Swiss-Prot record:
Belongs to the TmcAL family. GO terms for biological process: tRNA modification. This is tRNA(Met) cytidine acetate ligase. It comes from Latilactobacillus sakei subsp. sakei (strain 23K). The keyword Iron does not apply.
Length: 391
């Protein structure tokens, strides 16, 4: 069986994602397409607009055969760590190919990944505080390999390639040309494709959802209209309270709170009247907005280095949904994988020290804002066919 994996957030799922699912299956001649999808929090440190179960069902409705959750410890990380967790999970699921969108589909990612892992380790030398880590890494790659990585999906593709090259048995890499809208585009035009960030902006600004009907499937439009959406504005009062109430010593214990960043948080928090104002006040040449957003989320959820270290050691496969073809693969996977396959969360699993302890803890925040239980009493979605799915 030919199995192709896709790494995604679907925040939210739109026409560009459907195109990628179709092209991944077609170009790799896949019998099965598995999506490794971020849970309720995404790579840039934000809560997803829609919960993971809704997004998984939308993926199944639009071409995925199986959807598994990328754990928080990998999902809310810089590109290299995000890629490592996702690629390793897809390899464990039996994928032979990883498909991803790229602005440079003819680029040889396979070769670049191998070249990069053969380079000497340089990250410790990136100490220019007038530049972000990503900028310094890009300059290093350009100097050593003449690689110019100035587009977000190209950077992610390189990260996938490096993580893949480190596998004992690397997978095939399939870069699919992005259609029209680029990652980060902030406008929705009359074209059938728009970036996820442009779509989120329409939703969060209160614009009529009818403006999106030509760029998202009907299921996404209905979910956005019917679901309880979780935005930064809703989380802001709680984040402000957390920053103001924690001492410097306590802030210093937060994951990725380094280089004296805790002092900056304390200095600017009293002047900030919104999440956006806080980020603008925190921003320096050293930190990207994505890095600051992740740290804010770590503060909000009280994520400490030990949480991440323990989470990375608790490897498992968390099923969110599958169709009949995915179910057939699941039966075979149970015979071959050493990883626990989780379809139901028991009280023991969900305890603080349990296999899914961290996921249960971070998802509780979403549940406080009206989302249904995200772990207990939930079963994987079995998608039978068009417009029919059962949990």
């Amino acid at each position: 069986m030919r199995i192709t994996g896709i790494i995604a957030e679907y925040n939210p799922l739109h026409n560009g994602h459907i195109y990628q699912l179709q092209q991944a299956r077609q170009q790799s001649q896949a019998d099965l397409v598995i999506v490794c999808m971020s849970g309720n929090y995404v790579q840039r440190g934000q809560a997803a607009l829609l919960d993971k179960w809704t997004r998984a069902e939308l993926a199944l409705q639009n071409g995925a055969d199986m959807v598994v959750e990328l754990p928080f410890v990998s999902a809310v990380q810089p590109a290299d760590r995000f890629a490592t967790g996702a690629v390793q999970l897809l390899a464990a699921l039996g994928c032979q190919t990883i498909a991803f969108g790229s602005e440079q589909p003819t680029f040889d990612y396979q070769q670049a990944g191998q070249q990069i892992i053969d380079l000497p380790e340089q990250s410790a030398a990136f100490v220019d505080y007038q530049k972000t880590y990503a900028t310094q890494l890009n300059e290093f790659y350009q100097e050593q390999l003449s690689l110019q990585i100035d587009q977000p999906n190209h950077l992610l593709g390189i990260s996938y390639a490096v993580a893949n090259a480190r596998l004992a048995q690397p997978l095939n890499l399939l870069a699919i040309k992005r259609e029209q809208a680029q990652h980060g585009d902030q406008t929705v035009s009359t074209a059938p494709y728009a970036s996820a960030s442009a779509i989120r902006q329409v939703v969060t600004q209160g614009t009529a959802l009818a403006a999106l009907q030509h760029v998202v499937p009907a299921g996404t439009l209905a979910a956005l209209a019917d679901s309880t959406l979780l935005t930064e504005d809703q989380l802001w009062p709680l984040l402000k309270y957390r920053i103001e109430s924690l001492s410097l010593a306590q802030l210093r214990q937060v994951y990725q709170m380094s280089e004296g960043l805790e002092y900056r948080f304390k200095k600017v928090i009293h002047k900030a009247n919104s999440y956006t104002e806080l980020l603008q006040a925190l921003k320096t040449k050293r930190y990207t907005y994505a890095r600051l957003q992740r740290v804010c989320l770590y503060v909000l959820l009280n994520i400490q280095p030990a949480d991440i270290q323990q989470g990375l050691q608790r490897t498992y496969i968390r099923l969110l949904g599958f169709n009949e073809i995915g179910q057939q693969h699941l039966h075979q996977l149970k015979k071959t994988t050493d990883l626990p396959i989780i379809s139901k969360v028991s009280a023991k699993m969900g305890a603080e020290t349990g296999l899914l302890g961290l996921e249960v803890r971070v998802d509780r925040l979403c549940e406080q804002f009206g989302w249904q239980s995200q772990n207990f009493a939930r079963q994987p979605i079995f998608y039978h066919g068009k417009d029919e799915a059962h949990c």
